[in-house]
């Protein structure tokens, strides 16, 4: 054969092998088990993304019956695990998120026979809908296919089942997000100006516990009083009173929020004498909801989904 013919044969062989591999990864292997039964004796482990918000969000999920534990940190080894098992074409956030979960399993911090893995999904604005398939692929490499993968999502995701939180759970998640946004805004401002380093973090720890309790209770009427008390507590911290340049941090959501993913950019900005500003997590969720409305208006997308998004925004 000529060199060109040999290369063409090789290309066809590689394409066939890749197609067969993808089909094998995506087709169901067993009869689906109801989610309640599947997770009856399992703890659901969630990867870290937003250190201020996620402890409160986990408390909200616990109040609706799901035992959710947050992985504590992103070790350098976790990122190495992500690089090892996630395709190089995937984005860096996928490597960080999946690497956290794989690292916990490989270090035996998580018992694979009594655990499940949780991924949060946007269902539209980015490639995060691919994460469950990438994670299941990595689990197969590690011979851990028995570990369930579940999603916290506004729609159906191939390769994973979706946690059902109901309207009560949705209300609690919204409250958790608002508490987290308030804490984030206040803590970043005070950290940039505090005279005694650590004052802001002590208030964050205190108010995280209060916010987790309030979000779990689902009492929306309490939020306004707590927000005022939160502002009073943070502004009672001794501060330098100087006006500093405010530096906005923008970009992919995980990279913005997680210190291990953004190389500690928040602390670096503070050390340079400026005040970091992070967008609200609630604003990101509103963006996701408006995406459904735009899809219906511009591209003829599902109107029912757009109506649901409009009601949630209201």
Explain the meaning of each model-derived region.
Residues 1-314:
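An N-terminal assembly and electron-transfer interface module characteristic of large anaerobic redox
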